[in-house]
From Swiss-Prot:
It comes from the Bacteria. One of its GO terms (molecular function) is polyphosphate kinase activity. Its EC number is 2.7.4.1. The lineage of its organism: Bacteria, Pseudomonadati, Pseudomonadota, Betaproteobacteria, Neisseriales. Catalyzes the reversible transfer of the terminal phosphate of ATP to form a long-chain polyphosphate (polyP). Mg(2+) binds at R375, R405. GO terms for cellular component: polyphosphate kinase complex. ATP binds at N45, Y468, R564, H592. This is Polyphosphate kinase. It is an enzyme of class 2 (transferase).
Length: 685
């Protein structure tokens, strides 16, 4: 196969992932309000796609227009391909919302009322709502030499209003801009009695269209057109110019709201001259204009399920499994000393990790606590426990990653609070994101210091621990806990990388470990020994790993990869990758665990890791991979993380050589296997 065709386009692969998510919104087996949620997830993902990936392609095209990307194409060619795919996906989204979901919701008594269908009583209520809730806070900006075109915030809802007449100062007016503050709901619920006892909603844009004239008394409104600008949201900090990273991040967060435009969304009813006017204001081309059949922001529909009390239209609740040995008065440290603990979230509760930190904060025998924070949410019992530990006089060290994309402001806030509580807060290593998920507790026992560590594949975030699938290992293994301590010393101090006993770390040893393990399986296959690689991750795009997998496949290694999102490897190509199979599982839970298993002549070397197989994870982040050696725990990781995923025939998508996906289905006479439901049955409470 030609060199340029061996690697697929990562952006197209990411859009293909979102197409699989959108299939959940189409699936009649998914509860109706959950289908609406999946539609919103796709919109949110697309926002980030334009803010990050499309913005990167635009920058690359400007700086290196002739440089070929990993997929063998130049940036301009890739932009054209990606734009076409994005348009197709967005059209599909709106068709689904307008022609499928809205009618199905209406049959369930959940209505989105268009202006032309408002009853007189609804019109009266909506006008009162506008007068009471919107009119006092909206600020129209007329465009003239003293009122230049305003700079809209990233992804904010705005309206271009065409006017006729003269204002109070005798000025002729042609156009004004009205910005809708983010604090306003984009979907407004109507009183039940106005909806025949059901649930009714109107879009904020519809309310503004109907009553925008009240913002311009005495003027004639000729037209009102919603628009939304997506901006480049890359956050860059120059290492040489920064004295205080936290302060620099805070400054950059403000500037990010006003990055270069990458996408302009308007309703399909917007006239051509308004579209052209807006494109000129934002220095965008027609290729960057997206006309949609409906509201320009479907993300905000995610408020609807919480406003509708219809359990029959939502997923049934699950009960998480709990660590039975952790009784009311039991010590988690005593449990860990007996044997390492493996947790599989969300099927098993995240509470033992929280309990470990709570107990550490209150236990007089605990001398020090260390933890990394990448994403932790706006409310965190873990961070509260760290603050309590610091206030109790313990040595608390927290590595807060301030560059966690779109969580920067939240992490800055936690960093301030932790410092005020007396914790030592470190902002990682400049130029390398600290993505490793690790915690360490140091306790005095019988006159000797004993370490306890937690290593995970997911964030210390209690909210996402109920949604994302992840593994966590809690252990008192002396070599692993010593390694975790060494990693914290590397991050917080200065010096050369320490020698690790069992863990592998990026950016130093993890990539080499993966390449070496693949090479070993390749040699085993060449020698006629059984050879197999099974791995699960979020993304696989690193070219040297892909080429190593191709070599392994050519040698006869059987390779099964479970990759939820981006995968730029081509599976199933004769002579290149015929022994590689790739599947993606999309379901109620977000598959997030990273698990690698190398057969190694029957030893089944198994790791859980914070790292995907991407260049950034191997070379530009601090990551960990921990071996799972306890026989029972290894069996669990292989079965729950890999084998059951490979058996799924209800939510699995099978990747094709061209980068497309086909949904798996049970063969004739085969029973259904549903990874996530089966794990709830196996591990749930």
């Amino acid at each position: 196969m030609p060199e340029q065709n061996r690697i697929l386009c990562r952006e197209l692969s990411l859009l293909a992932f979102n197409r699989r998510v959108l299939a959940q919104a189409e699936d009649q087996n998914v509860p109706l309000l959950e289908r609406l949620c999946f539609l919103c997830i796709v919109s949110s993902n697309l926002d980030e796609f334009f803010e990050v990936r499309m913005a990167w392609l635009k920058r690359e095209n400007k700086l290196h227009p002739r440089r070929r990307l990993d997929n063998g194409k130049m940036p301009s060619e890739t932009i054209a391909d990606v734009t076409e795919a994005a348009r197709s996906l967005i059209r599909h989204q709106y068709d689904l919302f307008n022609n499928v979901l809205q009618p199905e919701l209406a049959r369930e008594g959940i209505h989105f009322y268009r202006r032309r269908n408002w009853t007189d009583t609804q019109k009266k209520w909506i006008e009162d709502y506008f007068d009471r809730e919107l009119l006092p806070i909206l600020t129209p900006i007329g465009l003239d030499p003293s009122h230049p075109f305003p700079r809209p915030l990233n992804k904010s809802l705005n309206f271009a209003v065409e006017l006729d007449g003269t204002d109070a100062f005798g000025r002729p007016s042609g156009m004004a801009i009205v910005q809708a503050p983010r604090i306003l709901p984009r979907v407004v619920p109507l009183p039940s009695e106005l909806c025949g006892g059901g649930h009714g909603f109107v879009f904020l844009s519809s309310i503004l269209h109907a009553h925008v004239g009240k913002l311009f008394p005495g003027m004639n409104v000729k037209g009102c057109h919603q628009f939304r600008l997506t901006r480049d949201s890359d956050l860059t900090v120059d290492e040489e110019d920064v004295q205080n990273l936290r302060a620099a991040i805070q400054n950059e967060l403000h500037d990010r709201e006003y990055g270069d435009g990458v996408r302009l969304e308007v309703a399909d009813t917007c006239p051509a001259y308004i579209r052209d006017f807006l494109l000129a204001q934002f220095k965008l081309t027609a290729a960057e204009l997206y006309q949609v059949k409906g509201p320009v922001n479907l993300v905000r529909l995610n408020a609807v399920p919480d406003l509708v009390d219809r359990p029959d239209l939502k997923f049934p609740p699950h009960t998480q499994g709990r660590l039975k040995a952790l009784g009311k008065n039991g010590s988690i440290f005593k449990l860990i000393r007996r044997a390492p603990i493996l947790l599989h979230h969300p099927y098993q509760s995240f509470n033992p990790v929280v309990e470990m930190m709570r107990e550490a904060a209150a236990d007089p025998a605990v001398l020090a606590v260390k933890m990394t924070i990448y994403r932790t949410g706006t409310r965190s019992e873990l961070v509260r426990a760290l603050m309590k530990a610091a206030l109790a006089g313990k040595q608390v060290t927290v590595v807060v990653e301030l560059m966690a994309r779109f969580d920067e402001a939240n992490n800055v806030n936690w960093a301030k609070q932790l410092e005020e509580a007396g914790a030592h807060v470190v902002y990682g290593v400049f130029g390398y994101k600290v993505h490793a998920k690790m915690a360490l507790v140091i306790r005095r026992e019988d006159g000797v210091l004993k370490r306890y560590a937690h290593l995970g594949t997911g964030n210390y975030h209690q909210g996402t621990s109920r949604i994302y699938t992840d593994f966590g290992l809690i252990t008192a293994d002396e070599q692993i806990t010593a390694d975790v301590n060494t990693l914290f010393m590397e991050i917080t101090g200065l010096g050369k990388p320490g020698r690790l006993n069992k863990l592998y770390q990026s950016p130093f040893t993890l990539h080499k470990m993966v390449i070496d393990r693949i090479a070993r399986e390749t040699e085993h296959a060449k020698a006629g020994k059984p050879a197999r690689i099974t791995a699960k991750m979020n993304s696989l795009i690193e070219p040297t790993v892909i080429e190593a997998l191709y070599r392994a496949s050519a040698a006869g290694v059987q390779i099964d990869l479970i990759v939820r999102g981006m995968c730029t490897l081509r599976p199933g190509v004769k002579g290149l990758s015929e022994n590689i199979r790739v599947r993606s599982i999309i379901g109620r839970q977000l598959e997030h665990a990273r698990v690698y298993c190398f057969h190694n002549n029957g030893a089944d070397d198994t790791f859980i890791s914070s790292a995907d197989w991407m260049g950034r994870n191997f070379f530009r982040r601090i990551e960990t991979a921990a071996p799972i050696t306890a026989p029972e725990l290894k069996k669990r990781v292989i079965r729950e993380g890999l084998e059951m995923a490979l058996a799924d025939n209800t939510h699995a998508w099978l990747m094709q050589p061209d980068g497309g996906y086909i949904r798996a289905a049970p063969a004739e006479g085969e029973s259904e296997a549903d990874l996530q439901n089966d794990l709830w049955t196996l591990l749930g409470g």
